[in-house]
């Protein structure tokens, strides 16, 4: 008769021993893993022992998807494995390969704080006009002005009109005193070029032809008298330019008066520049109303 001490010893369950003996074949070894395909599913059965020495059966089901890849990628998958992985099955081995999402590397020039905005001297000058066009007052060179072609056509038409004998040719400019002496020596005013010429009398208000006055509207606030002089001078000689300015800001009020010497030049200025795009605005050029003389 067995003693009572033997009855108190822990023994494995009879059902566990039967299952383990059926799976291991009474050899005590772990059976190899198996793989079964059922349509689009792949069932992988694996065996392992836990910390207590019990045999565990792990069944993993995978869904097989067929994807079209590039030819180079398909060739790489057919490469033979080498080293410790030469006996592995096709595909990644979870013991040596970790499949995860793609990680995109973003390089930054400033490692400490990439979002910090440092004081860049070029950014400080971005709000200032370093380059200013002489035609449209934009932030670009005069040679790259979008209105350059339109002004060239106007200058070409004026040259053709001047060559045909029409009035309005500008008078010859006086000689430059600095060009009279190239040696750099002092020349007395009486000995300079043009000293013996007789001065011309200035025309009085009654002699001024106010019928050759035009009114220009829709000007920008940055417009100056020199800009109007450069724009209207090719059309004929100008006797006076009046640009209306604000007495506090000294900026243009948007209109000006141009007095031409000849009425034909004023009419041609209205025909050529009325509707012309200047400084992102469309100019309106018309005849000015005559002033009332007392």
From Swiss-Prot:
Keyword Cytoplasm: yes
Compartments where found: Cytoplasm
Pfam families reported for this sequence: eIF3g (PF12353), RRM_1 (PF00076)
Ranges in a coiled coil: none
Keywords: Cytoplasm, Initiation factor, Protein biosynthesis, RNA-binding
Domain RRM: 212-290
Family matches, as SMART domains: RRM (SM00360)
Predominant location: cytoplasm
CDD domains: eIF3G, RRM_eIF3G_like
Function description: RNA-binding component of the eukaryotic translation initiation factor 3 (eIF-3) complex, which is involved in protein synthesis of a specialized repertoire of mRNAs and, together with other initiation factors, stimulates binding of mRNA and methionyl-tRNAi to the 40S ribosome. The eIF-3 complex specifically targets and initiates translation of a subset of mRNAs involved in cell proliferation. This subunit can bind 18S rRNA.
Protein's name in the database: Eukaryotic translation initiation factor 3 subunit G
